[in-house]
């Protein structure tokens, strides 16, 4: 009998809800297990006998078969592990993290990891950190979660349906294999799944920008600082990413022979793969070894044999010799993304207990094969502190001619302590972007020198040798793009006075620049350059009298960037006219 007024369908649903309630009354046991635990206890539903009256709840019966093993092992699942072979900050499930890394964690970014939430029973891993332990430890709990929904999935009969199948495209390399696997192109569900699950992941045939350089066993390690100044050896070297870092390493001087990061072999023994996942290897060749003594003197060794750190007892002190202080990689690559050559230079030194902890320096540079490297002053915008790129145009229609010395393309006078213009006549100071500079010197004159000869000499001192006519707008401007270069505007100011000699006294260079591009990453662009030569009148001196004149040069940088303004679209205008007799016959 069922209560009066309740429809049969509602009674059936109530019966199902009562069956589920009997399962959810029991609290799942919380256990702490290792990360390799994969067994899951799935809740099951009993069957409803046909003789049982509807609406009568009962406890779930025993399962008709063995419970399935979860497809996803949540104990090894880590969604925040984004860096291979490297610890991710605040990722408590990252297997690459150690107790040293846990000491800088603030909390677990992913505290709970679960599988498919549609199953009736599923495993869940709860991660936390125990900061009371020394060192801090990672704590995880493997628990069972019960899904109270009556429409949950009890068992999965077709496991391949839980993931997408990426079919393999036939080509000349795999056509014969597909023919044997497909059995004459008569595919069933089992055979289709069997060969698609064994597909090889396509690998890149070349290195791309930012891709870690692979070695025969792992990747090329480039130590750097992570969250502090301490060195981290698990940082991969990225393709075409030039780096220069300094980091500190805490060492025990008595164990210096056992620390790999202090040995040359740690950096020279790996072999770089020519392309990713290739069998061709490029050995690292040691090009030079420089020995640094305790008093900072440098001596280059004639041979390039690999040296090992050695602990030496010098009286009451202990010294460790042949310790790696600086490492410089120079990798040569082709335009096809292949590494063809790897050179390595070392600076070895002697470490005493006075210099512990030890500071190391690491550099890596990439050079394209069959090319001559050209240093830039920015890419694309100028970088503060780098020299301005300048040159001259020999004839109309040609490109810009630049000197090979990038620090000698646009220069001013060089100030010395003696303030003598003729002492260092050929020495000049480069104009650096963003640096407002002023320099000068003194020139002694006698009355026997004619005014025109003195004026010509002063001009040569101010302009220097080969003063340019054009300045590059960006730090990476090409010499052949002549129309993009900014011409230098020359201005001459003079103050005439009767019975006087006109001598140039100052050269003032004004560089106007603006911020170009996105507001998030603006680039410095030069828009105007003016060179103003200022002349003054000097009275004619009598023969035999000496006098001293002061000449100076100055460079100023002016930011002419306009403030950013928000852009608004004009409101839409309806260009429509009503018919002439629209209001007829009322008007």
Swiss-Prot record:
Localization, UniProt: Cytoplasm, Cytoskeleton, Cilium basal body; Secreted
Organism: Homo sapiens
Coiled coil location: none
Residues bearing glycans: 36, 295, 528
Assembly, per entry: Part of the tectonic-like complex (also named B9 complex).
GO CC entries: cytoskeleton; cytosol; extracellular space; membrane; MKS complex
Main location: cytoplasm
Role: Component of the tectonic-like complex, a complex localized at the transition zone of primary cilia and acting as a barrier that prevents diffusion of transmembrane proteins between the cilia and plasma membranes. Regulator of Hedgehog (Hh), required for both activation and inhibition of the Hh pathway in the patterning of the neural tube. During neural tube development, it is required for formation of the most ventral cell types and for full Hh pathway activation.
Protein name (record): Tectonic-1
